[in-house]
């Protein structure tokens, strides 16, 4: 498979061959679903907690005597049926939400997401941004040239690309990650992918 490579002006400068096993497979919906659920589960802090009857402050003595008042018997004003009482079977921080997805399925999900973007023509490859020092204005100009400014965009670059990281971090709807930080949620959450040519090579080294 061949994909167009653009320059910072949005002009096609060449074509490169990419691995069909990464960019041209039939997207596996179940693998992508499982990987997204697993990633979202791992993002949960799990610090939720409610107090039981024994943990709520107060309620140490019986509110009224057992017999003779005509009212229902009560042992504590912190029993669950009382306002301000303890919670029965509430959430505790001991609950674990982690879901396991094996490496093979996770790789299949990433390849499926890449292939889906290619099929939908929602991926662009850029040779270089041509930005010498951090500049949000310069990055916005490049995105305008590529006609993706205002889109929910994921930029994938390589390690050590501090200039482009700093140039894009204040732009609304733009997220930038390295090829080593690729994850299924960011890929599917973005409407468009903008990948550097060097990142394409790094991705193919890992996922081939």
UniProtKB/Swiss-Prot annotation:
The biological processes this protein is annotated with in GO are:
translation
Regions crossing the membrane: none
> SUPFAM superfamilies this protein is in?
Ribosomal protein L4 (SSF52166)
Top-rank lineage group of the source organism:
Bacteria
Q: Name one GO molecular function term.
A: rRNA binding
State the GO CC annotations.
Answer: ribonucleoprotein complex; ribosome
The answer to keyword Ribonucleoprotein applying to this record is: yes
Arranged from A to Z, the UniProt key words for this protein are: Ribonucleoprotein, Ribosomal protein, RNA-binding, rRNA-binding
Return the annotated region ranges for Disordered.
42-77
On whether Hydrolase is a keyword of this UniProt record, the answer is no
Q: Which InterPro entries match?
A: Ribosomal_uL4 (IPR002136), Ribosomal_uL4-like (IPR013005), Ribosomal_uL4_dom_sf (IPR023574)
Assembly and interaction partners: Part of the 50S ribosomal subunit.
Spell out the family assignment given in the record's similarity comment: Belongs to the universal ribosomal protein uL4 family.
Function according to Swiss-Prot or TrEMBL: One of the primary rRNA binding proteins, this protein initially binds near the 5'-end of the 23S rRNA. It is important during the early stages of 50S assembly. It makes multiple contacts with different domains of the 23S rRNA in the assembled 50S subunit and ribosome. Forms part of the polypeptide exit tunnel.
PANTHER family, alphabetically?
Answer: 50S RIBOSOMAL PROTEIN L4, LARGE RIBOSOMAL SUBUNIT PROTEIN UL4M
Q: What is the protein's given name?
A: Large ribosomal subunit protein uL4
Source organism per entry reads: Spiroplasma kunkelii
Q: What lineage does UniProt assign to this protein's organism?
A: Bacteria, Bacillati, Mycoplasmatota, Mollicutes, Entomoplasmatales
């Amino acid at each position: 498979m061949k994909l167009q490579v653009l320059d910072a002006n949005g002009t096609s400068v060449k074509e490169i061959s990419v691995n069909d096993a990464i960019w041209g497979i039939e997207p596996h919906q179940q693998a992508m679903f499982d990987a997204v659920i697993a990633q979202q589960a791992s993002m949960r802090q799990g610090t939720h907690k409610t107090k039981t009857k024994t943990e709520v402050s107060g309620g140490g003595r019986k509110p009224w005597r057992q017999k003779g008042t005509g009212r229902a018997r009560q042992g504590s004003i912190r029993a669950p049926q009382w306002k301000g009482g303890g919670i029965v079977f509430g959430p505790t921080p001991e609950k674990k939400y982690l879901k396991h997805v094996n490496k093979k399925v996770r790789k299949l999900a990433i390849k499926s997401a890449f292939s889906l973007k290619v099929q939908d023509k929602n991926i662009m490859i850029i040779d270089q941004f041509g930005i010498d020092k951090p500049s949000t204005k310069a990055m916005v100009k490049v995105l305008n040239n590529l006609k993706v400014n205002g889109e929910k965009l994921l930029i994938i670059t390589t390690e050590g690309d501090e200039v482009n990281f700093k140039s894009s971090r204040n732009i609304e709807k733009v997220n930038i990650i390295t090829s080593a930080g690729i994850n299924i949620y960011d890929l599917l959450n973005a409407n468009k992918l903008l990948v550097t040519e060097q990142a394409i090579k790094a991705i193919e080294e890992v996922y081939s």
